[in-house]
Amino acid sequence: MKIIVVLAVLMLVSAQVCLVSAAEMGHSSDNELSSRDLVKRFFLPPCAYKGTCNH
């Protein structure tokens, strides 16, 4: 059963990578957008964009 869980996690991770790479290719004309910004956009909660997170 653990193998199934590992495969599911790998599929989710690869799907996120595909989303990031697709967004990166779609915005290739904008040099301002880096892969780090895209990762933040996908993985950070919405409050991070507004600066209201309590860290």
Swiss-Prot record:
Disulfide bonds join 47-53. Its main location: secreted. One of its GO terms (cellular component) is extracellular region. The keyword Transmembrane helix does not apply. The keyword Chloroplast does not apply. Residues 1-15 form the signal peptide. One of its GO terms (biological process) is defense response. It comes from the Eukaryota. Transmembrane segments: none annotated. It is found in: Secreted. Expressed by the skin glands. Coiled coil: none annotated. Residues 16-41, 54-55 form a propeptide. Keywords: Amphibian defense peptide, Disulfide bond, Secreted, Signal. This is Riparin-1.4. It comes from Crinia riparia (Streambank froglet).
